[in-house]
Amino acid sequence: MLLQTIPSFERIGDYATNLEELGEKLATEGGSFSEKAKQELEILTTAVREILDTTIQALSENDSELVKTIEPLEEVIDDMVRLLKDRHTKRLKNGSCSVTSGLIFIDALTHLERASDHCSSIAVLMLARDNAEILANHYDYVRHLHEGTDKHYASELRRRREQYVDQLYKL
Protein backbone atom coordinates (compact mmCIF):
# COMPACT_ATOMS: atom_id res chain seq x y z
CA MET A 1 0.00 0.00 0.00
CA LEU A 2 2.82 2.40 0.81
CA LEU A 3 4.21 2.04 -2.71
CA GLN A 4 0.79 2.93 -4.14
CA THR A 5 0.90 6.30 -2.33
CA ILE A 6 4.20 7.38 -3.88
CA PRO A 7 2.70 8.83 -7.11
CA SER A 8 0.26 10.92 -5.06
CA PHE A 9 3.05 12.29 -2.88
CA GLU A 10 5.10 13.04 -6.00
CA ARG A 11 2.18 14.97 -7.51
CA ILE A 12 1.70 16.90 -4.26
CA GLY A 13 5.36 17.89 -4.51
CA ASP A 14 4.82 18.96 -8.12
CA TYR A 15 1.91 21.17 -7.05
CA ALA A 16 4.08 22.75 -4.34
CA THR A 17 6.70 23.54 -6.99
CA ASN A 18 3.99 24.98 -9.25
CA LEU A 19 2.80 27.21 -6.41
CA GLU A 20 6.33 28.46 -5.82
CA GLU A 21 6.65 29.27 -9.53
CA LEU A 22 3.34 31.16 -9.45
CA GLY A 23 4.62 33.22 -6.52
CA GLU A 24 7.80 34.04 -8.43
CA LYS A 25 5.77 34.98 -11.52
CA LEU A 26 3.54 37.26 -9.46
CA ALA A 27 6.60 38.96 -7.95
CA THR A 28 8.46 39.36 -11.27
CA GLU A 29 5.46 40.76 -13.05
CA GLY A 30 4.75 43.21 -10.24
CA GLY A 31 1.34 41.75 -9.60
CA SER A 32 -0.48 41.49 -6.33
CA PHE A 33 -3.71 40.21 -4.85
CA SER A 34 -6.35 42.33 -3.18
CA GLU A 35 -6.52 42.16 0.61
CA LYS A 36 -9.69 40.10 0.38
CA ALA A 37 -8.07 37.64 -2.05
CA LYS A 38 -5.09 37.33 0.32
CA GLN A 39 -7.42 36.59 3.24
CA GLU A 40 -9.32 34.02 1.20
CA LEU A 41 -6.11 32.34 0.10
CA GLU A 42 -4.86 32.23 3.70
CA ILE A 43 -7.99 30.40 4.87
CA LEU A 44 -7.73 27.93 1.98
CA THR A 45 -4.02 27.28 2.52
CA THR A 46 -4.68 26.65 6.21
CA ALA A 47 -7.19 23.94 5.24
CA VAL A 48 -4.78 22.44 2.70
CA ARG A 49 -1.93 22.43 5.23
CA GLU A 50 -4.23 20.64 7.64
CA ILE A 51 -5.25 17.96 5.14
CA LEU A 52 -1.59 17.39 4.22
CA ASP A 53 -0.56 17.13 7.88
CA THR A 54 -3.49 14.83 8.66
CA THR A 55 -2.69 12.57 5.70
CA ILE A 56 0.96 12.25 6.70
CA GLN A 57 0.06 11.64 10.34
CA ALA A 58 -2.63 9.06 9.51
CA LEU A 59 -0.22 7.22 7.22
CA SER A 60 2.76 7.31 9.56
CA GLU A 61 0.69 6.26 12.59
CA ASN A 62 -1.51 3.86 10.63
CA ASP A 63 -4.51 5.59 12.22
CA SER A 64 -7.73 4.32 10.64
CA GLU A 65 -9.91 6.79 12.57
CA LEU A 66 -7.83 9.82 11.62
CA VAL A 67 -7.86 8.76 7.97
CA LYS A 68 -11.68 9.02 7.99
CA THR A 69 -11.40 12.77 8.63
CA ILE A 70 -9.57 13.38 5.35
CA GLU A 71 -12.38 12.98 2.81
CA PRO A 72 -14.77 15.42 4.53
CA LEU A 73 -12.01 18.04 4.66
CA GLU A 74 -11.20 17.39 0.99
CA GLU A 75 -14.84 18.00 0.05
CA VAL A 76 -14.84 21.25 2.03
CA ILE A 77 -11.68 22.33 0.19
CA ASP A 78 -13.48 21.62 -3.10
CA ASP A 79 -16.39 23.80 -1.91
CA MET A 80 -14.00 26.57 -0.90
CA VAL A 81 -12.22 26.53 -4.25
CA ARG A 82 -15.53 26.75 -6.15
CA LEU A 83 -16.59 29.72 -4.00
CA LEU A 84 -13.23 31.47 -4.36
CA LYS A 85 -13.15 30.98 -8.13
CA ASP A 86 -16.63 32.51 -8.38
CA ARG A 87 -15.63 35.46 -6.20
CA HIS A 88 -12.42 36.02 -8.10
CA THR A 89 -14.19 35.89 -11.45
CA LYS A 90 -16.42 38.71 -10.19
CA ARG A 91 -13.33 40.71 -9.16
CA LEU A 92 -11.89 40.21 -12.64
CA LYS A 93 -15.14 41.31 -14.28
CA ASN A 94 -15.45 44.46 -12.19
CA GLY A 95 -11.80 45.38 -12.75
CA SER A 96 -10.69 45.17 -9.12
CA CYS A 97 -8.06 42.60 -10.11
CA SER A 98 -5.66 42.50 -13.05
CA VAL A 99 -5.89 39.68 -15.56
CA THR A 100 -2.35 38.47 -14.77
CA SER A 101 -2.91 38.41 -11.01
CA GLY A 102 -6.33 36.88 -11.52
CA LEU A 103 -5.02 34.02 -13.60
CA ILE A 104 -2.26 33.35 -11.07
CA PHE A 105 -4.85 33.30 -8.28
CA ILE A 106 -7.04 30.82 -10.19
CA ASP A 107 -4.02 28.61 -10.96
CA ALA A 108 -3.03 28.65 -7.28
CA LEU A 109 -6.53 27.55 -6.28
CA THR A 110 -6.37 24.70 -8.78
CA HIS A 111 -2.99 23.47 -7.51
CA LEU A 112 -4.15 23.59 -3.89
CA GLU A 113 -7.33 21.70 -4.73
CA ARG A 114 -5.43 19.01 -6.63
CA ALA A 115 -3.01 18.52 -3.74
CA SER A 116 -6.01 17.88 -1.48
CA ASP A 117 -7.43 15.46 -4.07
CA HIS A 118 -4.27 13.38 -3.74
CA CYS A 119 -4.67 13.35 0.04
CA SER A 120 -8.12 11.87 -0.54
CA SER A 121 -6.63 9.22 -2.83
CA ILE A 122 -4.08 8.29 -0.17
CA ALA A 123 -6.84 8.08 2.46
CA VAL A 124 -8.93 5.77 0.28
CA LEU A 125 -5.90 3.54 -0.31
CA MET A 126 -5.39 3.31 3.44
CA LEU A 127 -9.04 2.42 4.04
CA ALA A 128 -9.04 -0.10 1.18
CA ARG A 129 -6.16 -1.96 2.76
CA ASP A 130 -8.55 -3.35 5.40
CA ASN A 131 -11.80 -3.32 3.43
CA ALA A 132 -12.36 -5.50 0.37
CA GLU A 133 -15.45 -3.52 -0.71
CA ILE A 134 -13.51 -0.25 -0.85
CA LEU A 135 -10.64 -2.01 -2.59
CA ALA A 136 -13.02 -3.41 -5.22
CA ASN A 137 -14.58 -0.04 -6.04
CA HIS A 138 -13.25 3.02 -4.27
CA TYR A 139 -15.29 5.35 -6.51
CA ASP A 140 -18.53 3.87 -5.15
CA TYR A 141 -17.20 4.28 -1.62
CA VAL A 142 -16.47 7.99 -2.12
CA ARG A 143 -19.78 8.54 -3.94
CA HIS A 144 -21.60 6.88 -1.03
CA LEU A 145 -19.86 9.23 1.41
CA HIS A 146 -20.79 12.27 -0.66
CA GLU A 147 -24.43 11.19 -0.66
CA GLY A 148 -24.45 11.92 3.07
CA THR A 149 -25.66 8.58 4.40
CA ASP A 150 -22.61 8.00 6.63
CA LYS A 151 -23.25 9.78 9.95
CA HIS A 152 -19.58 10.15 10.92
CA TYR A 153 -18.76 11.63 7.53
CA ALA A 154 -21.75 14.00 7.62
CA SER A 155 -20.83 15.19 11.10
CA GLU A 156 -17.20 15.79 10.16
CA LEU A 157 -18.24 17.54 6.94
CA ARG A 158 -20.53 19.88 8.89
CA ARG A 159 -17.78 20.61 11.41
CA ARG A 160 -15.26 21.38 8.65
CA ARG A 161 -17.68 23.66 6.81
CA GLU A 162 -18.23 25.59 10.03
CA GLN A 163 -14.48 25.74 10.56
CA TYR A 164 -13.47 26.93 7.09
CA VAL A 165 -16.33 27.89 4.77
CA ASP A 166 -18.01 30.03 7.41
CA GLN A 167 -14.78 32.05 7.69
CA LEU A 168 -14.96 32.82 3.98
CA TYR A 169 -18.53 34.07 4.26
CA LYS A 170 -17.48 36.41 7.08
CA LEU A 171 -15.00 38.21 4.82
Where are these regions (language model features)?
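Cytosolic, long alpha-helical scaffolding segments
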Residues: 1-171
